[in-house]
Amino acid sequence: MTETTIFQKIINEEIPCDKLYEDKFCIAFNDIQAQAPVHFLVIPKKPIITLLECIEQDANLLGHLLFVGSKIAKSKNLTNWRTGINTGAESGQTVFHLHIHFLSGRKMNWPPG
């Protein structure tokens, strides 16, 4: 059996979060380990570990996650932000439930690592 992640516990309302948005497909909340003045996550309610596990039927869901993040960013009057998905431990993924980072409020450097 797969370990229940902190994100699944948030989805199940077992632990609180600073929720920004929720619908039947996803939930968005502020990152508790913010790396920028604005740093929120959008996660699917479907338990997908990484992009590697996505299948063709997930394409609309992935687009929805990006759309929701953009909608939240616009509601915060953001005009510049970075969007990122870490896939696997070596990329920096620490919670193994797919999530999209939206960061803003400071100049982003490249390369990011």
Regions found by a protein language model. Give the residues of each.
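HIT superfamily nucleotide-processing domains
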Residues: 1-113
